[in-house]
From Swiss-Prot:
Protein name (record): ATP-dependent Clp protease ATP-binding subunit ClpX
Database matches in HAMAP family: ClpX
Residues binding ATP: P122, T123, G124, C125, G126, K127, T128, Y129
Function field: ATP-dependent specificity component of the Clp protease. It directs the protease to specific substrates. Can perform chaperone functions in the absence of ClpP. Degrades anti-sigma-D factor RsdA when present in a complex with ClpP1 and ClpP2. Does not seem to act on anti-sigma-L factor RslA.
NCBIfam families for the chain: clpX, PRK05342.1
Protein species of origin: Mycobacterium tuberculosis (strain ATCC 25618 / H37Rv)
A Pfam family of this chain: AAA_2
GO MF, one example: ATP hydrolysis activity
Length: 426
C-alpha cells in the first residue's frame, strides 16, 4: 500500500518504499505512487537500452559510397581523401562486427587487424573537419587531441592516456561505447624526432611520445585516471580496451614534400621539361607518392608508421574550392551569417565577386578554409555592430569593394510601413 500506518497520512513510493519526506516529489497514480528518484532510474534504464539498440549493425552500416556522399554535403574537394576514409571507416566497423560474430561462430575465426589512418596535408584544408563529419554520420563518440601537449610518462605535460579520457568523456563515461569511438590526434608531425637516427639523449616530447602511443594505437587494456592528469598509486582507474578504437592521426608535415622530391627525382630541365603554373603547383597532391622511408626520414619511427597502414592526403584548396566552401555546404559560412542577420530582421547578400575576393584573401594569407571566417568577421564587423541598434535597415549587400578596399557594405534602407507613414504625416 502507499500509506504508512493505520490512520497516518504519510505517503510512500510504491516502488522503493521511501516516504514522502525522504524524496523531493511523489507523483500519484490510480492506487499507486512513484517518487522522482524512481523516475530518474527508469529514464536511465530506458536510455541505456536505447543506446544499445543504436549500436551500428552491419546491415545498417553505410557503404563507402554513402559515406563519401555524406561527406560531399559538408566538405568541398579532397575526393581522394574522402574515398580513402570512407573505405577505411567501413572496413573498421565491419571488422568490429566480424569479431563479435566470430565469438558466436563454430567456424575457425579469422582475426582482422586494425587499420588506423594517417592524414597528410597543409593546414586549413579539411583534415579535422573530415574526421568530425565522419563521427557525426556514424553517431560514435569522437575526441580530438593535440600531439604537441603530450610528453612521455614521468615528464611535465599530458600522458597519452589523457587522450582516452577525452573519448570516455565524449561517450558520457560509457566505456563500452567509447571502445568503438574515433580519436583524432592532430599535429602529429610535431612529435617527429629531430633526426632519422635513434637519439642517444631522451626526446620526451618527440620519439618518447611516439613510443608511448604505440600500445594504444595497436590495441591494449589501458588504465585511465578519471580526473585526468598524472597517475599516482592510490587512485582508481577506468579500464578501457583500445582494440576497436579507430585512430586518425594528422599533420601538415611541412618539408616532407622535399624529401619525396629527393627520392622521386627532380623534374628535368630544358625544352622537354613540363612547365606548370604556380596555381597548379600549389594545388598538387605533394604527398600522393609518400612512402614509409620518407616518413622515417622526416622523423617518425618505423613502429609508429607500421601502426598507421592507411594513408590519406589532402591538397591545398584552390580559389574555386574556397568559393564553394563559402556558399555550398549545408552549414556554409554564408548561410550562417545570413541566419545571424535574419535574427535581426535584416537580409544579407554577398555578390559573386565578393566571394571570390574573400577566397583570394584566404589564399594570400595562406590560411586555407580556416581563414575564411576571420576574413568575413573583419568585413561584417562594422554592420554587425550597428544593425542591432537600428530599425531602418532592410538589406546589407557585400561587394568586391567591401572586401578589397575595406569600405562599408551597401545598406538598403527599409521602406516605412503604412502606419509609420500615417504617424509621420500626423
Amino acid at each position: 500500500m502507499a500509506r504508512i500506518g493505520d490512520g497516518g497520512d504519510l505517503l510512500k513510493c510504491s516502488f522503493c518504499g521511501k516516504s514522502q519526506k525522504q524524496v523531493k516529489k511523489l507523483i500519484a497514480g490510480p492506487g499507486v505512487y512513484i517518487c522522482d528518484e524512481c523516475i530518474d532510474l527508469c529514464n536511465e534504464i530506458i536510455e541505456e537500452e536505447l543506446a544499445d539498440a543504436d549500436d551500428v549493425k552491419l546491415d545498417e552500416l553505410p557503404k563507402p559510397a554513402e559515406i563519401r556522399e555524406f561527406l560531399e554535403g559538408y566538405v568541398i574537394g579532397q575526393d581522394t581523401a574522402k574515398r580513402t576514409l570512407a573505405v577505411a571507416v567501413y572496413n573498421h566497423y565491419k571488422r568490429i562486427q566480424a569479431g563479435e560474430k566470430g565469438r558466436d561462430s563454430r567456424c575457425e575465426p579469422v582475426e582482422l587487424t586494425k587499420s588506423n589512418i594517417l592524414m597528410l596535408g597543409p593546414t586549413g584544408c579539411g583534415k579535422t573537419y573530415l574526421a568530425q563529419t565522419l563521427a557525426k554520420m556514424l553517431n560514435v563518440p569522437f575526441a580530438i587531441a593535440d600531439a604537441t601537449a603530450l610528453t612521455e610518462a614521468g615528464y611535465v605535460g599530458e600522458d597519452v592516456e589523457n587522450i582516452l579520457l577525452k573519448l570516455i568523456q565524449a561517450a558520457d563515461y560509457d566505456v563500452k561505447r567509447a571502445e568503438t569511438g574515433i580519436i583524432y590526434i592532430d599535429e602529429v608531425d610535431k612529435i617527429a624526432r629531430k633526426s632519422e637516427n635513434p637519439s642517444i639523449t631522451r626526446d620526451v616530447s618527440g620519439e618518447g611520445v611516439q613510443q608511448a602511443l604505440l600500445k594504444i594505437l595497436e590495441g591494449t587494456q589501458a588504465s585511465v585516471p578519471p580526473q585526468g592528469g598524472r597517475k599516482h598509486p592510490h587512485q582508481e582507474f577506468i579500464q578501457i580496451d583500445t582494440t576497436n578504437v579507430l585512430f586518425i592521426v594528422a599533420g601538415a608535415f611541412a618539408g616532407l614534400e622535399k624529401i619525396i622530391y629527393e627520392r622521386v627525382g627532380k623534374r628535368g630541365l630544358g625544352f622537354g621539361a613540363e612547365v606548370r603554373s604556380k596555381a597548379e603547383i600549389d594545388t598538387t597532391d605533394h604527398f600522393a607518392d609518400v612512402m614509409p622511408e620518407d616518413l622515417i626520414k622526416f622523423g617518425l619511427i618505423p613502429e609508429f608508421i607500421g601502426r598507421l597502414p592507411v594513408v590519406a592526403s589532402v591538397t591545398n584548396l584552390d580559389k574555386e574550392s574556397l568559393v564553394k566552401i563559402l556558399s555550398e555546404p549545408k552549414n556554409a559560412l554564408v548561410k550562417q551569417y545570413i541566419r545571424l542577420f535574419e535574427m535581426d530582421g535584416v537580409e544579407l547578400e554577398f555578390t559573386d565577386d565578393a566571394l571570390e575576393a574573400i577566397a583570394d584573401q584566404a589564399i594570400h594569407r595562406g590560411t586555407g578554409a580556416r581563414g575564411l571566417r576571420a576574413i568575413m568577421e573583419e568585413v561584417l564587423l562594422p554592420v554587425m555592430y550597428d544593425i542591432p541598434s537600428r530599425d531602418d535597415v532592410a538589406k546589407v549587400v557585400v561587394t568586391k569593394e567591401t572586401v578589397q578596399d575595406n569600405v562599408l557594405p551597401t545598406i538598403v534602407p527599409r521602406k516605412p510601413s503604412r502606419s509609420e507613414r500615417r504617424d509621420k504625416s500626423a
